[in-house]
Amino acid sequence: MQRRLVQQWSVAVFLLSYAVPSCGRSVEGLSRRLKRAVSEHQLLHDKGKSIQDLRRRFFLHHLIAEIHTAEIRATSEVSPNSKPSPNTKNHPVRFGSDDEGRYLTQETNKVETYKEQPLKTPGKKKKGKPGKRKEQEKKKRRTRSAWLDSGVTGSGLEGDHLSDTSTTSLELDSRRH
């Protein structure tokens, strides 16, 4: 008796653990159907969320429209020809527009959006005024010659040494060009 009971249990466990197609469908087909059901649930959830968001927008739009018209009525009753104070902002409020996701919550609703500056095309760099370096070298030579002519001899520097440095600077200048 116990042997027969163990045998029946083992067959039952085997049948339950073995993947058997049910109703002509494979087990993989069943899992696909379950996945489809999950995606359907996600779709319904997203749809419900969007409907709730739309209702919230309509409610806020209606609420702000009442506030906006109440503000206009109050100001028009006070004085019809008065100018608005300069510190008030008159930014247009837009609802339900397609560009709603572009703005952060702390940004104001300005009409103009930020426009990126066009990138500069790489081109030739501007060169300085031609001959500027030569003019600087001439100035240096003039100051040296004025210094030598002023009578600062005996300072330990010889005239030949100074003329050598001016020659080397001229040589360097000619090498650069």
Swiss-Prot record:
Changing S169T: In a breast cancer sample; somatic mutation. The keyword Cytoplasm applies. The keyword Thylakoid does not apply. Residues 74-177 are annotated as: Disordered. It comes from the Eukaryota. One of its GO terms (molecular function) is hormone activity. Changing R57A: Strongly reduced affinity for PTH1R. Residues 57-68 are annotated as: Important for receptor binding. It holds the Pfam family Parathyroid. Residues 25-34 form a propeptide. There are 3 principal secretory forms, called PTHrP[1-36], PTHrP[38-94], and osteostatin (PTHrP[107-139]) arising from endoproteolytic cleavage of the initial translation product. Each of these secretory forms is believed to have one or more of its own receptors that mediates the normal paracrine, autocrine and endocrine actions. A motif (Nuclear localization signal) lies at residues 108-129. Residues 122-132 have a biased composition (Basic residues). Keywords: Calcium, Cleavage on pair of basic residues, Cytoplasm, Disease variant, Hormone, Nucleus, Secreted, Signal. Ubiquitous. Also expressed in the mammary gland. Transmembrane segments: none annotated. Belongs to the parathyroid hormone family. Interacts with PTH1R (via N-terminal extracellular domain). It is linked to Brachydactyly E2: A form of brachydactyly. Brachydactyly defines a group of inherited malformations characterized by shortening of the digits due to abnormal development of the phalanges and/or the metacarpals. Brachydactyly type E is characterized by shortening of the fingers mainly in the metacarpals and metatarsals. Wide variability in the number of digits affected occurs from person to person, even in the same family. Some individuals are moderately short of stature. Neuroendocrine peptide which is a critical regulator of cellular and organ growth, development, migration, differentiation and survival and of epithelial calcium ion transport. Acts by binding to its receptor, PTH1R, activating G protein-coupled receptor signaling. Regulates endochondral bone development and epithelial-mesenchymal interactions during the formation of the mammary glands and teeth. Required for skeletal homeostasis. Promotes mammary mesenchyme differentiation and bud outgrowth by modulating mesenchymal cell responsiveness to BMPs. This is Parathyroid hormone-related protein.
